[in-house]
Structure formats: structure tokens, C-alpha cells
């Protein structure tokens, strides 16, 4: 009787384990088919160039493939490194602008041309750095962390300093009081965005 019961239990478990193994293999097959080469979310500028229907894909310059995504990661790294270097140069330009602007407000108008020249160079470097960040290929995966992170703070501050940069340039000739307020907002938020990665 014990032998008969053991035999029946043994025979009943064989088909069950085979089904579990089949389900496991089926799950593995479907999971490999669903691997995406692009992250689930991208900035609209990245989607414009690097998305599945982006300009790089449609023009066939960088068709979506594993090999090309590896190349894109190298391009991304170089673009973000350049973004960082240009960011430091832009910050230095903003400091110089602060010194020159203060002298202008004190009545030293001999520095007006220098202030405008450095202002234009700083604006060009600012938007070049912003473009490198906004148009870099997207990361492999989207990392969404709960709570505050240095990258979230950097992006929030970028929204502030981007708006302040536009306001500073628009108000340069129109209204000195608001130009100064916009430039202080620009410098404060930009410096904080640079420093947020250091701490």
C-alpha cells in the first residue's frame, strides 16, 4: 500500500514539474523578446533625435540596434563631459559678468563693451552646454528614484536658470532693475545646479 501511494504521488508530480519548467521557459522566451533598447521615458529633445521614430532612426544614420546603442553611449558620455566642462566655463563667465555689472551700476561705463562681449560669450557657452545635455542620446534605462536626488535637483534648477537666462538677455536693454534681479536668479540657480553634484 505504501509503495502504491508513493508511486501515485510520484506520477502526479512529474507532469506538474514539467508544466512549471515549460512555464519558466515560456516566460524566459517572452522576456527576451520584450527587452527594449530605449528607456521608458526620454526628454522630448532626445525623443526627437534618438527615439524609435526620431530623426537619427528615420534618416538611417543610427538605426536602432544593440551595436548602435553602444556607440550612442560613448557619444552620450562625451557630450555630457563637454556639457560639464562648458558649464564650468559658463559659471566663470557669469562671475566675470557679476563683477563687471556691479562696476557698471556704480557708473564705470568704460566697461560696457566688455560687459556685452563677455555677456554674449557667456550666453553662447550657456546654450551650447544646454544643447549638449538636451540632445545627448538617452541613457539605457530610466532611473526613477523616490525622493530627492542630485540629478532631480540639477534638473529643477536648470528650469529656473534657463528661464532666468532668457529673462536676463531680454531685459538687458529694457529694464536695469529687472535685468539685475534676473541675473542674480540666474547666477544663484546656476551655481547651485553646478554644486549639487559635488555634495
Indicate residue ranges for each PLM-predicted region.
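N-terminal targeting leaders of membrane proteins
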Residues: 16-113, 129-145
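Juxtamembrane helix-capping/reentrant segments at transmembrane boundaries
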Residues: 145-153
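Intrinsically disordered/low-complexity terminal segments and short unstructured peptides
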Residues: 4-5, 12, 29-31, 44, ...
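Bacterial Sec-dependent N-terminal signal peptides
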Residues: 1-20
Amino acid at each position: 500500500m505504501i509503495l502504491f501511494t508513493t508511486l501515485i504521488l510520484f506520477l502526479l508530480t512529474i507532469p506538474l514539474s514539467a508544466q512549471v519548467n515549460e512555464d519558466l521557459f515560456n516566460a524566459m522566451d517572452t522576456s527576451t523578446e520584450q527587452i527594449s533598447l530605449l528607456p521608458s521615458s526620454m526628454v522630448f529633445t532626445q525623443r526627437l533625435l534618438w527615439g524609435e521614430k526620431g530623426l537619427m532612426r528615420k534618416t538611417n544614420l543610427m538605426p536602432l540596434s544593440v551595436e548602435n546603442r553602444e556607440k550612442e553611449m560613448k557619444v552620450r558620455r562625451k557630450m555630457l563631459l563637454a556639457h560639464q566642462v562648458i558649464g564650468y566655463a559658463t559659471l566663470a563667465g557669469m562671475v566675470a559678468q557679476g563683477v563687471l555689472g556691479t562696476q557698471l551700476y556704480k557708473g564705470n561705463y568704460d566697461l560696457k563693451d566688455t560687459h556685452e562681449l563677455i555677456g554674449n560669450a557667456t550666453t553662447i557657452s550657456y546654450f551650447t552646454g544646454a544643447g549638449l545635455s538636451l540632445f545627448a542620446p538617452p541613457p539605457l534605462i530610466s532611473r526613477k528614484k523616490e525622493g530627492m536626488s542630485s540629478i532631480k535637483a540639477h534638473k529643477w534648477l536648470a528650469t529656473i536658470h534657463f528661464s532666468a537666462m532668457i529673462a536676463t538677455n531680454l531685459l538687458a536693454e529694457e529694464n536695469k532693475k529687472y535685468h539685475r534681479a534676473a541675473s542674480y536668479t540666474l547666477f544663484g540657480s546656476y551655481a547651485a545646479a553646478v554644486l549639487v553634484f559635488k555634495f
